Every structure is written in C-alpha cells, then in structure tokens.
Amino acid sequence: MMLNCHCRDCQRATGSAYAAFAIFPKAAVSLKGEPCWYRVIGSSGKPIERGFCPTCGNPMTVRLDAAPDIIGFHAASLDDPARYRPAMDLFTASAHPWDLMQADTIKKAGGLAS
C-alpha cells in the first residue's frame, strides 16, 4: 500500500507538502546494510524513527512505534516508484490549502489509527 502523510513532521522532514510512503510488513523486508536512524516524536505525539542512507544521506524509511509490524519506504527512493499508487492521505487536517490531493484516496484527518 502507498500513502501520503501530510503531518507537519513529514512536511518538515521532506521539505515538501507531504511524504509519500510505500508500506510493507516489516517481516517481509530485508535491508542491505543499516540506515542511520533518527528518533523523534511525530505529529501523533508518538515516537517514530526515520532511516537515512549512510552514504548519501537521502531519506529512506520510517518506523512507527504505534505500528511496529510495518515499515514505510519513501516511494521515490524505490527502484520502480511508478509501480505504486497512493491509496490514502493521512493527517489531512495539516495539509496546505494549495496541496491538491487525489480525489480517489481515503482521507484521514489524523494518522493510521484515527
């Protein structure tokens, strides 16, 4: 599944209107090497970890304490980002008025649990 997160934390972390993530079950993923992890309190008030490439510093992944069985990858960092299509927009209450979301995605004012 792919989702767009419009929370202020993702906006600040990406320097963009939202972060586009492809979400996978953590058990189905293996990484070649270990990202550099940065732990913060997200817009939900819960801890999140953002993983960055240790070679170039590009943002790669996100792990949520609130959803320990999944891992998100920045969609544009994947080998074939066109393979994924957003199904959901999260934290739409934080979206900018000029951020035109796709009409056919599920919209949530808060996070996954809302």
Regions picked out by a protein language model, each given a short descriptive name:
Residues 1-114:
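A short Gly-Trp-Pro
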